[in-house]
A protein has these predicted regions:
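Conserved CoA-thioester-binding segment of acyl-CoA-metabolizing enzymes
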Residues: 1-48, 67, 81
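Structural motif
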Residues: 93-94, 124
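CoA-thioester-processing core
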Residues: 99-153, 182, 186
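C-terminal long alpha-helix characteristic of the crotonase
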Residues: 114-119, 170-218, 243-246
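Glycine-rich phosphate-binding loop at the start of an alpha helix
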Residues: 55, 73, 77, 100, ...
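Well-ordered beta-strand positions
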Residues: 111, 151, 155-157, 163, ...
Length: 246
């Protein structure tokens, strides 16, 4: 990952292979980039190639024991909530696939702009047999209309960018070649607003959501681990990893 500056706007580029899968190293780098935002007044996060972020790095995680996996998922939750609570506006420029953890990452942004291209967006955890961590559910409930929760969370549907716009996952959809310019322009417009009031309103909106996400994180985390380590899910995960390695 790397960070660039465009005046008052910081641009965070995820560069972790062609899928931008979420590994322990990517989480630490992302957390470090947050520290580097400095005096930026808005930020844009995007991926590369055909992927914004294709989710958790399953090949690196599937053989972890429960204790180690617990540490990873807790760190994942900490980082996504830190992004959710950023004091400055964050724009997700979703350039391609945003699946499972990748969709979760995009959902932490204030504004999500998608590229109108062939891509899959959504939370397919239930199709593998995994639950959704408590913090993910809290932010999802807050970010999308209630009518979208069944297809996204319960059915685990992966949808096209146009369907993502209809479901409220995206706020805007633009031609692929215009994505970054549009996201940077939206961020610059937000950066031009008086910062004190903007930060106060964002904090007031998001603080109760983050508090609810943390309230039952430990209990919900153990329930999530139960689904991850169930025999059926482990079998499905290993089948998925086998396909990814081909």
């Amino acid at each position: 990952m790397r960070i660039e500056r465009n005046g008052p706007v910081a641009l965070l580029r995820m560069e972790n292979g062609k899928a931008n899968a979420i590994s322990a190293a990517l989480l630490e780098r992302l957390d470090g980039l947050i520290e580097e935002l400095g005096d930026a007044r808005a930020a844009v996060i995007t991926g590369q190639g055909t992927a914004f972020c294709a989710g958790l790095d399953l090949p690196a995680l599937v053989d972890l024991d429960r204790t180690t996996m617990r540490g990873f998922i807790r760190r994942f939750e900490q980082v996504i909530l830190r992004i959710f609570e950023l004091p400055i506006p964050l724009i997700a420029a979703v350039n391609g696939h945003a699946v499972a953890g990748g969709c979760v990452l995009a959902l932490q942004a204030d504004v999500r702009i998608g590229a109108d291209r062939d891509a899959r967006i959504g939370l397919n955890e239930t199709r593998i047999g995994i639950g959704l961590p408590g913090p993910v559910l809290e932010t999802l409930r807050w970010q999308v209309p209630g009518s979208s929760l069944t297809p996204l969370a319960l059915e685990g549907r992966l949808v096209s960018p146009r369907e993502a716009l209809q479901l409220g996952l995206f706020h805007d959809l633009v031609p692929e070649g215009d994505l970054l310019d549009r996201a940077l322009k939206r961020a610059a417009d937000l950066a031009a607003l008086p910062p004190a009031g903007l930060r106060r309103v964002k904090e007031s909106l998001r603080k109760p959501v983050a508090a609810a996400a943390r309230a039952n994180a430990t209990t919900e985390g153990e329930l999530w681990l139960d689904t991850w380590f169930s025999p059926d899910t482990q079998s499905r995960l290993r089948e998925t990893v086998s396909r990814l390695k081909k």
